[in-house]
A protein has these predicted regions:
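A structural signal for short hydrophobic/aromatic patches embedded in well-ordered alpha helices
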Residues: 55-56, 81, 140
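Short, amphipathic alpha-helical "recognition" segments used to contact nucleic acids or chromatin
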Residues: 75-88
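Charged, often Cys/His-bearing segments associated with DNA-binding zinc-finger transcription factors
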Residues: 1-67
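Short acidic-aromatic active-site loops that bind/stabilize oxyanions
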Residues: 42-46, 71, 271, 275
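Structural recognition of short helix-loop-helix hairpins that underlie histone-fold modules
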Residues: 57-71, 89-91, 289-294
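Short alpha-helical segments in extracytoplasmic peptidoglycan/chitin-binding modules
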Residues: 49, 81, 95
């Protein structure tokens, strides 16, 4: 009984501390304008430049909902907090301590969920598109032929793993054991397809880490589309994949055993060089948005983790559109997680 007053005092003290931190963070936010940061520091902190970030906010804000409370965070801060998290990958601690954002970790988490879903729902359908018309296919083929001398390629395909925390054991729709990949960690196996300029043409983050690259492609709408196009007479368009995929009329992969100096060896060499963009795409994507990099575990349920992956992939294409280059030393190098030769991580 004697401990009750102490306990009550502790609760009051904790409430007072929370109120103080809430007021402090608001005062800190009000006193600083992130858009007054030097451009180099802004890009380092938020991974996009200031002009592109403003454009992103303009695209999303009309769909962000009404601010019902004066204490509610301005939408631009929610976007900045999301960009900072995507770029750092250190969960919410570094974001919460960023004085330019000055938000609590729960607020960061809510903002991340909100903004990633907005980007996925509104922008991803416009910015990540697989070629379907002859004009689109011809343009992509021209890029591959000009760079690598390989005819007919309309994309490079591979899988890349993004680590996540163990899903709840009670989640019957996402049983933890199916997310354990070949490296023994829980992950999502993401199917990526890109063009010769590292633009992402397709991104599928629905499958757990135990699912093979080829199995994901086999049930994809893209494979079904390629098969139907082939059956309707388009026999000059194909994807480029590694040995983790099966050879198909619309998917070229390496020939397993070839004689030195043979045409088959030359084909394998040309195929390998033509696959370079998918490795580079993965490196740029994870280098810019380091929450996806190997060993930076996403502490989210698989569904929310997928939204983060989709948002980062969409922003990757938007950054390419804006010619926002990434320093070579920032490009991630991962080569030990895939299912085939020269696998992307």
């Amino acid at each position: 009984i004697n401990n009750i007053p102490v306990f009550i005092y502790g609760l009051l003290e904790e409430d007072e501390r929370r109120n103080y931190m809430r007021i402090y963070r608001k005062q800190l936010r009000d006193s600083q304008n992130p858009f007054e940061m030097p451009e180099v520091e802004f890009i380092k902190t938020f991974r996009l430049n200031q002009d592109l970030t403003r454009i992103l906010i303009e695209w999303l804000e009309p769909h962000a909902g009404i601010r019902r409370r004066t204490t509610k965070l301005p939408f631009y801060l929610e976007v900045l907090a999301t960009l900072n998290f995507l770029g750092t990958g250190s969960y919410q601690h570094s974001v919460g301590s960023c004085t330019w954002v000055a938000m609590s970790q729960p607020a960061i988490s809510r903002s991340l969920k909100k903004v990633c879903r907005l980007v996925t729902g509104l922008l991803m359908p416009e910015w990540i598109k697989f070629p379907t018309t002859m004009e689109e296919k011809t343009a992509i083929k021209g890029g591959f032929y000009e760079k690598f001398g390989f005819r007919g390629a309309i994309g490079c395909i591979d899988g890349t793993h993004v680590e996540i925390i163990t899903p709840p054991i009670t989640d019957v729709d996402h049983p933890p054991h199916v997310y354990i990949d070949r490296n023994g960690v829980h992950s999502i196996n993401v199917m990526l397809i890109c063009d010769s300029n590292c633009k992402i043409l397709a991104c599928d983050a629905r499958f757990p880490g135990s699912v093979h690259d080829s199995a994901i492609f086999r049930v994809s709408d893209i494979r079904n589309n390629l098969r139907m196009c082939f059956e309707n007479g388009d026999d000059t368009s194909w994807l480029i994949g590694d040995s983790g995929y099966g050879q198909e009329p619309w998917l070229f992969t390496p020939i397993p055993v070839v004689a030195p100096g043979s045409p088959q060896e030359r084909y394998n060499q040309l195929l390998r060089s033509t696959r370079n963009p998918i490795e580079r795409t993965n490196g740029i994507l994870k280098g810019r948005f380091r929450c996806l990099i190997k060993h930076r575990v996403l502490h989210f349920h698989p569904v929310q983790a997928a939204y983060i992956i989709y948002a980062a992939s969409t922003l990757h294409n938007i950054a390419l559109w804006a010619n926002l280059a990434l320093d070579e030393d920032e490009i991630a190098v991962e080569n030990d997680e895939g299912n085939g030769d020269n696998a992307v991580g």
